[in-house]
Amino acid sequence: RYPMKLINGKYERISWDTALNEISAKMLDLKKASGPDSVYFVGSSKHNNEQAYLLRKFVSFWGSNNCDHQARICHSTTVAGVANTWGYGAMTNSYNDMQNSKVAMYIGSNAAEAHPVSLLHMLHAKETGCKMIVVDPRFTRTAAKADEYVRIRSGSDIAFLFGLLYHIFKNGWEDKQYINDRVFGMEKVKEEVLAKWTPDKVEDVCGVKEAQVLKVATWLHENRPGTVVWCMGQTQHTIGNAIVRASCILQLALGNVGKSGGGTNIFRGHDNVQGATDVGPNPDSLPGYYGLVEGSWKHFAKAWGVDFEWI
């Protein structure tokens, strides 16, 4: 394979040295004339971790944070929502660990078509008694495998999740010891849920009757540890971040986070969008989710063997 250059309306083959020299010269001219932010770098979730990391390092050396990749329209809402709930924006467990779950609730995920390998683990879990709940506006191929299918209105995920929390709090099903030891602010959530998200309000918003919401809440209570699975169905909303946080809060209330068979299984939209987000070209963070603050830059200046004042 060779690089191609458009000359007189036709692409002609040029050498790698010529391509690198011409591109480098034009980029430096742009930087000199308009500053480092005049160039925008687009990464890819198709890059492996090393390639994504190297691109972020290159952009940092270039003198800019003007970079991004597919996560911006994929799971950036998840990264922010999960990170702001318990500190790190990634799924907590793994595909194979779902075989240790006693109940699994899919909300915003059509795993049968989008992540078929993951569903094999769920089907194995069902063989040992795991209950499978699918919450989706459409009856999907995943819903066809469910023990309980819940049809909600599109975008009403929070109402349904808080409807579950209503019954959990009302019946005292929350893991009080876990919350006391590990969770801050759950009392405020409880107050709001019990005051505002009564069964009639939940049904009005998401279209699910109280009996079915209570049934799902009972299953989540009686079958622990349980996991919550989501994908694009949660993130592709203007309130995607809030939906993600509601899912996380539900798991914290049940004491399911940090346990085998529990947690949040967040299925990504591209093959390495998680790795690219962890270490790659994000405009608002350095590799490993280090924020764009002085301490982070000092850390990476040392790691990269360059002077902090230079970078």
PLM ranges: what are they?
Residues 190-195, 213-226:
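Core structural elements
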Residues 1-171, 182, 189, 209, ...:
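N-terminal export/assembly segments and adjacent metallocofactor-ligating motifs
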Residues 172-197, 202:
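Internal, active-site/partner-interface "lid" segment
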Residues 27-29, 91-95, 213-218, 253-254, ...:
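Generic recognition of flexible, low-complexity loop/linker segments
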